């Protein structure tokens, strides 16, 4: 699933094409791409002017010029990429185009989604108010986020993925952040010292900034930016996807386990803070 750097790459790519433009036509080619919307998407969007492309964590939306942007109940267009969603500029020759839109300057937007977990939905911004701030926001409160992380009774890896603690961190960047600060993903979040909780979140922010600088992480053709280009942060990963390979820091074999249904990669030797070595290897 696209994480913060991948979604932000799409947001930045989309912004110059759509801000100040209005929807001229919208066609939905698959019902799941507009699920939960009672009225036809074309009736809801045609004629509306786009004022901004916004994002929090993994969630992206379009703001409209005819809405009060300070009103939490304002309508926005949520564009959720799901597991494999892409927003592409121009016509795309693919059987997986789920939504096709045309703007008033003839710019075409294609929503391509092979696995159909993504969607476009018009609704109140308030519906995502429970999503926590993300570490790349300018006014992000690192101390408060550290306290939220320590308040969770799960292991720290699961707590990092909780979008009510901080948003935008997924499997890839959680593993990389924990490796960077040498903390085991199996350690209880509630057992972290405040300085360690802050260090983990700071590391997550650092690794996501580095990923964003190279367009995010692409393991296959399912994640590309608006121009169809892949990111290449996968070349810089230290632990994620490296199960069975030697740790770049200590040489120990990287382990892969499953936590909460998610594949988790870590070094049982140098990421041994907070759990015994025997527990870390199980």
Swiss-Prot record:
Note on how the cofactor is bound: Binds 1 zinc ion per subunit.
Stated EC number for the protein is 3.2.2.23, 4.2.99.18
State the protein's purpose. Involved in base excision repair of DNA damaged by oxidation or by mutagenic agents. Acts as a DNA glycosylase that recognizes and removes damaged bases. Has a preference for oxidized purines, such as 7,8-dihydro-8-oxoguanine (8-oxoG). Has AP (apurinic/apyrimidinic) lyase activity and introduces nicks in the DNA strand. Cleaves the DNA backbone by beta-delta elimination to generate a single-strand break at the site of the removed base with both 3'- and 5'-phosphates.
This protein's cofactor list reads:
Zn(2+)
Q: Identify the keywords attached in UniProt to this record, alphabetized.
A: DNA damage, DNA repair, DNA-binding, Glycosidase, Hydrolase, Lyase, Metal-binding, Multifunctional enzyme, Zinc, Zinc-finger
Organism in which the protein naturally occurs: Corynebacterium aurimucosum (strain ATCC 700975 / DSM 44827 / CIP 107346 / CN-1) (Corynebacterium nigricans)
Q: Its encoding gene is what? A: mutM
Q: How does it assemble?
A: Monomer.
Name the family the entry cites: Belongs to the FPG family.
Q: Which PANTHER family match?
A: FORMAMIDOPYRIMIDINE-DNA GLYCOSYLASE
Q: Name one GO biological process term.
A: base-excision repair
Q: Report the catalytic activity.
A: Hydrolysis of DNA containing ring-opened 7-methylguanine residues, releasing 2,6-diamino-4-hydroxy-5-(N-methyl)formamidopyrimidine; 2'-deoxyribonucleotide-(2'-deoxyribose 5'-phosphate)-2'-deoxyribonucleotide-DNA = a 3'-end 2'-deoxyribonucleotide-(2,3-dehydro-2,3-deoxyribose 5'-phosphate)-DNA + a 5'-end 5'-phospho-2'-deoxyribonucleoside-DNA + H(+)
Q: Where are the zinc fingers (FPG-type)?
A: 238-272
Query: This protein is called what?
Result: Formamidopyrimidine-DNA glycosylase
Residues annotated as binding DNA? 96, 115, 152
Q: Which Pfam families match?
A: Fapy_DNA_glyco, H2TH, zf-FPG_IleRS
Tell me which InterPro entries the record gives.
DNA_glyclase/AP_lyase_DNA-bd, DNA_glyclase_Znf_dom_DNA_BS, Formamido-pyr_DNA_Glyclase, FPG_cat, MutM-like_N-ter, Ribosomal_uS13-like_H2TH, Znf_DNA_glyclase/AP_lyase, Znf_FPG/IleRS
